Amino acid sequence: MLTATPLPHQLLATFLLVLASATQPAVPASTDRAALLAFRASLSPPSRAALSSWSGPLSPSWLGVSLHPATAPAPSVTTPSVAELSLRGLNLTGVIPAAPLALLRRLRTLDLSANALSGELPCSLPRSLLALDLSRNALSGAVPTCLPSSLPALRTLNLSANFLRLPLSPRLSFPARLAALDLSRNAISGAVPPRIVADPDNSALLLLDLSHNRFSGEIPAGIAAVRSLQGLFLADNQLSGDIPPGIGNLTYLQVLDLSNNRLSGSVPAGLAGCFQLLYLQLGGNQLSGALRPELDALASLKVLDLSNNKISGEIPLPLAGCRSLEVVDLSGNEISGELSSAVAKWLSLKFLSLAGNQLSGHLPDWMFSFPLLQWLDLSSNKFVGFIPDGGFNVSEVLNGGGGQGTPSESVLPPQLFVSASVDTVSWQLDLGYDVQATTGIDLSGNELCGEIPEGLVDMKGLEYLNLSCNYLAGQIPAGLGGMGRLHTLDFSHNGLSGEVPPGIAAMTVLEVLNLSYNSLSGPLPTTKFPGALAGNPGICSGKGCSENARTPEGKMEGSNHRGWLGGWHGENGWVSLGAFCISTMTSFYVSLATLLCSSNARNFVFRPVRVEY
């Protein structure tokens, strides 16, 4: 499952505030100056040193201080009052000095994020606040019920990445004016409050992020009543039960992330009502049933992640209507049948993973013909027949059209930017899907046979290629050495024969090579990977290479941990990619694969699937 980047996996929320001036009467600047000096005095000595510029008359030269412009000349007001206080990332320590802050009666924005402030959340903050950001500190305890009532004008509240642990009170309810609420990356337990917004019918809430906590119980139906929502993040909790069908009433919703919970039932057909949805992530749950054909109404959908569930059945043809899809991850399910021609209509695809399902049949001719394709993973299925030798020249990135070193920005995994504004508040989300920038193809752990197509090794932009644990036969194409960007190559556990192409020695960026357990012969073209050819009895090394020479069995070099689809176990550990990859292949299966994939059987075995656009 692919997860959202955590940031690394997962998600970053940044609030960009453009706030109108408050209309409250001016307060003498001397009061604000005294309040700021009292605030500084309440901090630890090292923290005070960070605010050494706070001396002399109150002015914009004070670090982190923005002032209201003077409205009219008056002898009693020599300088404006404080409008914004932004002390982000100054390593401030201690408890938030709320009493001095409460004296800043025209303060609109308070940003104390990315410090080391501790203690509990205060309630005695300026009632004039429109934006409060206390994220990335060491605050503990609970979100007090007095906080919303003490800040009636608040539009954005960010308390993410703290140590808040106590359950939210069922009476906790925020005012309808609130536009963005981020409580993510804490350890808050208990149930989600049934009415997190006091007046959902008149709510201005755009963003609700409760992800990466310990919330349990069902998703409250009241969330579906907040019709203004554009981003709903409940991922990485312990939520259970069905997905509320009422979520389909959120017609403004652009991002829905319920991944990594314990949700059950089926994917509700009502989600088709979220016709503006760009990002749908339901992976890592216990969802079952078939894919809903009604989802074809999501014509704007760019990211669809239903990985690691129990979804069964075939990929329905109506999903061809989702023509904007760029990232599709259906891996780790129980999807069966042949590849649907609906997939062929997703011409904007950059990432496609159907790994770890029960898909069968032949790989269609159009499988490699997506013009923007960057990553294709069909591993650990039941595909049979030959790898189609066509369509390899279509994808710009896989053919090296993105420049040297890394693919061009236009074909990297999508960075979705969702923005919205209500009156004077705007916010922006950087939803970088957690897809590695590597370009690659993984067909391991299937029942593919025949020879490796020449067109496949002509894809100069490939950085990762895994065809292991199949029944491939014939020689390794000589053009393999021309794949100058390839850093991982695995052809192990097949029936390949002949000599290893000498061009492998010129592949300077190659880090992982596994050609073990085939029927390869001849000399070693390189000594960089001494264990990569284990289980090939015909391989020999050195100038005295003879027919009976053997290379010592070893382990694959240059490996790193790769996760559930196959483990690189240590730097010199054994390699086995694909959940169903067998550790050895007996001579019986090698012979059987060679027979089935012989040139005489080719026309009988291979029946290509053709799709007309």
Swiss-Prot record:
Any one biological process term the GO annotation gives: regulation of meristem development
Main location: membrane
Glycosylation: residue positions: 91, 158, 249, 393, 466, 514
Molecular functions (GO terms): peptide receptor activity
Reported effect, residue 332 to R: No fasciation but slightly increased number of kernel rows
Transmembrane segments: 574-597
PANTHER family assigned: DNA DAMAGE-REPAIR/TOLERATION PROTEIN DRT100, L DOMAIN-LIKE PROTEIN
The name this protein goes by in its record: Leucine-rich repeat receptor-like protein FASCIATED EAR2
